[in-house]
Amino acid sequence: MNKMIKYVMSLLMVMTLCLPTMQAQVVNDEEVVEDNEDSAVADSAMVETIAADTLRLPWTETVKVGLDKLLKSKMFETSQVGIMVWDLEADSCIYRFRERQLMRPASTMKLVTAITALDKLGGSYQFKTTLKYTGTIDNGVLNGDVYCIGGMDPRFNNDDMTAFVTSLKDMGVDSIHGSIYADRSMKDEDLLGEGWCWDDNNPVLSPLVFGRKDIFMERFLAKLKDAGIFYAGSGTSVKRCPASAFTICTRFHTMDQILHKMMKDSDNLYAESMYYQIASSTGNRPASAKSARNVQRQLVRKIGLDPARYKFADGSGLSLYNYVSAELEVKLLRYAYQDENILPHLKQSLPIAGVDGTLKRRMRSGFAHGNVKAKTGTVTGVIGLAGYCKAANGHDLCFSILNNGIMHSNNARSFADKVCELLCQP
């Protein structure tokens, strides 16, 4: 019993001696924390700085992460999108997502048409409409026939028509004793493109267009009357001009003039006119959409893709039958970039973000503003954007974004704009 008491007393003495030390240690720990609060915050900031400086993702990885995040939008639960981004300086793919998925391109189809035309026809190509005659001119009387030869120039305007009539007057013609013909042999008789909707505002597919309407001959007769040139006939007919006919006047418009309107304003008439110039270049008369498609397929094969994988129907993108991919558009943009005979003409025709054309009201601020040069595409259920931009590292990029099955076009446009901002930001 005495031993037990002594043992307990000894234990209590030890605990009493140790308690101040234990309490001091706890206080010291609390003081350390309190005294070093500022240091702790500084250390935390230092870690973040180090992470930003040394652990920062390369630019290409930042783009990938950012695009992956954008693709998590609920919009893509009910719609489809294909994206491809290509670094033209490094000549390598930066990003791809369902880039081979077939999509309706809407007006980004005009990119395919423009690049094909520049490749086939060249930047110096001219759209022309010619006035010719047969017979003789005696004492102010043209004893013969007059031919208006259509070249499907969508830009032919009042000044051009005036030049036609003035040229006749300059030759001393006061009256025409013969017939006046419209030579429409340049293209086939199809008035609508394959797969066009009947209720769309479709362009007039005529080799002789005036004021966007099929009223060329009507206006020509009116101009003759205004100029005091008497015409003995009662109307006009359609007939191919003989090779022996003499030229009175030819009016030209340049490739760049047509491209500018076609791309900046997404003009369907201009695009279809371009399409039939491509067809006409094959030598097949009358020119047809089929001939133009064959030229497109040749170019697709030239850039290393299989044309059998795509469907081409028209030059404007109005057709519901067009099916392309983001990969195809990017490969064509890459091809154009590498050809000094194509790129200057193409690039100056593209809408500039926040500046002009169909991109004037988009990307009006931020890094994409004034940087992105791209063709828009919009039809019911489809939004597209494809073109060029410059990354913060100075590299030129080309990209294609094709979005199908959409209910709210503004959401799809916003998505495409965010993609462009991501590509352009540092």
What does each model-found stretch correspond to?
Residues 49-58, 96-105, 146-156, 165, ...:
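Second-shell loop/turn segments in exported
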Residues 126-188, 196-203, 210:
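Active-site-adjacent, His/Asp/Glu-enriched structural segments that form or flank metal-binding
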Residues 311-314, 318-426:
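C-terminal soluble interaction/assembly domains
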Residues 1-30, 44, 54:
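Bacterial Sec-dependent N-terminal signal peptides
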Residues 82-86, 95-96, 113, 145-149, ...:
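Soluble periplasmic/extracytoplasmic beta-strand elements of cell-envelope proteins
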Residues 27-89, 93-101, 166-171:
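Beta-lactamase-like hydrolase cores
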Residues 213-349:
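A small/polar active-site loop signature that marks catalytic segments
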Residues 91, 105-123, 180, 219-224, ...:
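Active-site SXXK
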